[in-house]
Amino acid sequence: MRGGSLWQLGQSITRRLAQSDKKVVSRRYFASEADLKKTALYDFHVAHGGKMVPFAGWSMPIQYKDSIMDSTVNCRENGSLFDVAHMCGLSLKGKDCVPFLETLVVADVAGLAPGTGSLTVFTNEKGGAIDDSVITKVTDEHIYLVVNAGCRDKDLAHIEEHMKAFKSKGGDVSWHIHDERSLLALQGPLAAPVLQHLTKEDLSKLYFGNFQILDINGSTCFLTRTGYTGEDGFEISVPDEHAVDLAKAILEKSEGKVRLTGLGARDSLRLEAGLCLYGNDMEQHISPVEAGLTWAIGKRRRAEGGFLGADVILQQLKDGPTIRRVGFFSSGPPARSHSEVHDESGNKIGEITSGGFSPNLKKNIAMGYVKSGQHKTGTKVKILVRGKPYEGSITKMPFVATKYYKPT
């Protein structure tokens, strides 16, 4: 596909992200063009042809000169460099930082070895998801975590409220929000070999989910082997004043194969990887069990509870949820958020939460929720797009096999 079809695809994704952003902003805070925050790489994006759009109160590149489709494919074939500094990195410190965090998330934080991490979910009293987050135990008295841009204000207020209560009972915990640092995501098969050129540390011993503080390109960085694409890769927390130099060095060392990539391709990549987007696929009324994130609930936490909404979540683990997140293949136009899912008799059984055309599979994919009992792989469904039903089927996720770097 070339020319007009690709342009239409890009415009469709652009509109979808912009509409999603408007929904998020209207719920959480309003920002005019003049109020939009800019990352340390803003001028760098503009100089490289970045198309800047409002996203969660920030001016962020949705794409560059490459089409969204080409950028998505290039990430899986070579590599992509994303600016994700709109997300919020923070550190919790103190001898009680681990038990404090365990009151708010479902992960077995105490069971993590220093230098390792995991995806987790912040929950509310009803068992719903406040946000998902990648957390890392740097040491037994230092936790580093990253929360979503659109949830920043809500998450920080939530953490602060519970921290005050925890400290009032004698708990030793403090926090620091890393507003002085940028966050870059280097993803794809060339991520490790390119980054290895910029550090003396042996990255072959740093596996998926591992964390290290090290020198990269002459700057002290927080490096986590993780990402939002399903590919091998890294998230690099770098001081703001060194962010542009690091981005330039990564692009130069790749000899043009790793390309700057925007939010449009990032959305396609995470959808292909079957990963949730908070605000679409996860919300405050959806539990980790319903979202298919049971694996993120630590075994010890299932036995002991101790986090907000534990009674609801542990009951769902016992009885099973009433709805389940599943993947879909569909015919016709790509299904979008809020498209209804019907069974073959025309009864509504669920709803799409994310969908689009997969540049790597060359077919429509989507994820959403259906009633338990209707979630089996291979189940035939009808997906309504602009009121018209199209053939679809339920499938397992991820749609594209993940390539996380793990010990053999």
From Swiss-Prot:
EC number: 2.1.2.10
UniProt similarity note: Belongs to the GcvT family.
The protein's role, per its UniProt record: The glycine decarboxylase (GDC) or glycine cleavage system catalyzes the degradation of glycine.
Class of enzymatic activity (EC top level): transferase
InterPro entries: GCS_T, GCST_C, GCV_T_N, GcvT/YgfZ/DmdA, GcvT/YgfZ_C, TrmE/GcvT_dom1
Organism: Arabidopsis thaliana
Catalytic activity: N(6)-[(R)-S(8)-aminomethyldihydrolipoyl]-L-lysyl-[protein] + (6S)-5,6,7,8-tetrahydrofolate = N(6)-[(R)-dihydrolipoyl]-L-lysyl-[protein] + (6R)-5,10-methylene-5,6,7,8-tetrahydrofolate + NH4(+)
Annotated localization: Mitochondrion
Entry keyword Mitochondrion: yes
Entry-linked PANTHER family: AMINOMETHYLTRANSFERASE, AMINOMETHYLTRANSFERASE, MITOCHONDRIAL
GO molecular function per UniProt: aminomethyltransferase activity; mRNA binding; transaminase activity
Subunit structure: The glycine cleavage system is composed of four proteins: P, T, L and H.
Entries under Pfam families matching the protein: GCV_T (PF01571), GCV_T_C (PF08669)
Superkingdom per UniProt: Eukaryota
Transmembrane annotation, as ranges: none
Chain segment of the transit peptide: 1-24
A GO cellular-component term linked to this record: cytosolic ribosome
UniProt-recorded name of the protein: Aminomethyltransferase, mitochondrial
Keywords: Aminotransferase, Mitochondrion, Transferase, Transit peptide
One GO biological process term: glycine catabolic process
Residues involved in substrate binding: 235, 266, 404
